Regions:
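Helix-loop-helix hairpins and the membrane-proximal interhelical loops
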Residues: 22, 30, 36, 46-75, ...
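Alpha-helical membrane segments and immediately flanking helix-loop junctions
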Residues: 87-93, 97, 114, 280-351, ...
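Early transmembrane hairpin of solute transport permeases
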Residues: 20-173, 347
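Alpha-helical transmembrane segments in multi-pass membrane proteins
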Residues: 40, 86, 90, 94, ...
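Transmembrane alpha-helical segments and their short flanking loops
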Residues: 2-18, 53, 57-71, 275-284, ...
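Short, membrane-interfacial amphipathic segments enriched in basic
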Residues: 1-21, 63, 168-177, 212-217, ...
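Cytosolic juxtamembrane amphipathic/interface segments immediately preceding
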Residues: 8-30, 70-73, 177-188, 339-341
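Membrane-interfacial segments
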Residues: 47, 51-56, 97-105, 166-175, ...
Length: 445
């Protein structure tokens, strides 16, 4: 018992410190804001390929062939949303970190974007008809989409931290008379810190390239982002991430929030790559994405508690457990399961904690191998996490019935895993009540 309490205290202390770390706060808030943009782009991909595509969509039917002429609309939406996610992330992280640092304007976000572009190569060598041509003043797609996400986060944080430090130095502020409007005065006040920050970041990028022969993008992508992508795209890697999240849930800490700074950039980046490939008719590369997590590892909410709710209705006669299951079923359909986690409870419950941790690891493995074997389609559409089961499987895979069947299998497996533990938990409650009743009877005798 002492070890359990010590573990809970240690994890709780770590979670509190982790969530209060300002860089983590800024990154989490930024990706929450970005989510609608990703979903808009996702549904444009879905409509483009399932409705407007002249080969595979509804437009392939003669009567609906006119729909193909509308495809440029969805292509434009796709380009504007998915191809500039990194720019949006840099801008939002700059704003959020600036706000945390006490700067209430939007300028830190704009400065972060400027600094990011300062370290990004804008000259490209292209082979055209056997001859090498140099093209200047272009921003390649790999620098604006999720492939440069980690570089973007690093530059946004670095530039805003430098700017904040300089902005707090009174000697660097250009002070205007009191008659000057506050917004104009603030602009002049930020001028010298902004010049120094931009120059410092641009110089850093230039010196790094001169010394190493590599751009910052190449270094960060090869050393940090690519290895992390390989880990998370592996089955052991994603299962480990899920295990950590579930462990935090069990001690009463929001597990998904704890892993969000790692999970969101990598899994949202993976689904963005898939959506772009799907839109262009190329092979979809990634199995493990944000929809994969939702469709196979979080059905009904963390721990696949939809299986627990059904198992309770099947395996126990305990009225209070059934009432909690009934009340939790409505939110559970939309993958909201705090009522069952804290009401059953699963939190700090050693019996129900075991299947709560194990079940998503099993179903994640099922989903992974079903996709590897080609039975279930890969996710190519980002759908809201509150989308009900079966619907989210069908939508996220652009109509793969194999994915729907696999998700049904995962639900069935989750019920089978939870059933024996529900029976044990029910018996424990009954034994505790009988023991309490016997003690009460002995007192009254």
């Amino acid at each position: 018992m002492a070890f359990q309490e010590k573990l809970i205290d240690s994890l709780g202390s770590f979670a509190t410190k982790f969530n209060s770390y300002r860089y983590i706060m800024a990154i989490k808030a930024s990706f929450i804001t970005l989510m609608p943009v990703i979903i808009v782009g996702a549904f444009s991909v879905l409509i483009s390929n399932m409705v407007l595509d002249p080969k595979n969509g509804l437009a392939s039917f003669q009567a609906l062939s006119f729909l193909a002429a509308l495809k440029p609309i969805t292509s434009a939406i796709n380009y504007a949303t998915l191809n500039f996610l990194n720019i949006g992330a840099v801008f939002l992280i700059g704003i959020e970190l600036g706000r945390i640092n006490g700067i209430k304007t939007l300028f830190p976000g704009l400065l972060a974007v400027i600094c990011f572009i300062c370290v990004t190569p804008t000259t490209v060598e292209m082979l055209v008809e056997g001859e090498m041509h140099v093209v200047k003043d272009v921003l390649l797609r790999q620098f604006s989409d999720t492939r440069s996400l980690f570089l973007g986060m690093f530059i946004a944080i670095l530039s805003v931290e430098i700017y904040t430090w300089l902005e707090h130095r009174d000697g660097l502020k250009i002070k205007m008379p009191d008659t000057v409007p506050p917004n104009v005065s603030a602009s002049f006040s930020a001028l010298i810190p902004a010049i120094i920050t931009t120059t410092a970041i641009a110089t850093f990028g230039f010196v790094f390239h001169q010394v190493t022969g590599m751009y910052l993008y190449d270094a960060v992508y090869q050393v940090v982002q690519q290895p992390l992508e390989r880990v998370v795209q592996s089955l052991p890697g994603i299962l480990l991430l899920m295990f950590v999240a579930q462990l935090f849930w069990v001690i009463g800490i929001h597990g998904n929030q704890m892993i969000k700074p790692i999970r969101e950039p990598l899994l949202l980046g993976a689904i963005t790559v898939n959506m772009s490939a799907f839109e262009q008719g190329k092979e979809v590369p990634n199995i493990i994405t944000m929809p994969f997590w939702d469709v196979y590892m979080s059905i009904g909410g963390s721990g696949l508690t939809i299986g627990l709710l059904i198992a309770v209705m099947i395996a126990t006669k305990r009225k209070e457990m059934k009432e909690i299951a009934k009340l939790s079923f409505g939110p559970g359909i939309f993958n909201i399961n705090e009522p069952v986690i804290f009401g059953m409870p699963i939190m700090l419950n050693p019996i129900l904690a075991v299947p709560f941790i194990i079940t998503p690891l099993v179903t994640g493995s099922i989903g992974y191998f079903a996709t590897v074997m080609g039975f279930a389609g890969k996710a190519v559409v980002m759908v809201p996490w509150t989308t009900p089961p079966l619907i989210n499987a069908w939508l996220s895979t652009a109509g793969s019935m194999g994915a729907v069947v696999t998700q049904l299998l995962c639900i069935l497996v989750s019920i089978l895993i939870y059933l024996p533990f529900v029976k044990i938990a029910s018996r424990r409650v009954e034994q505790a009540q009988l023991q309490a009743a016997s003690v009460e009877t002995a007192k009254n005798a």
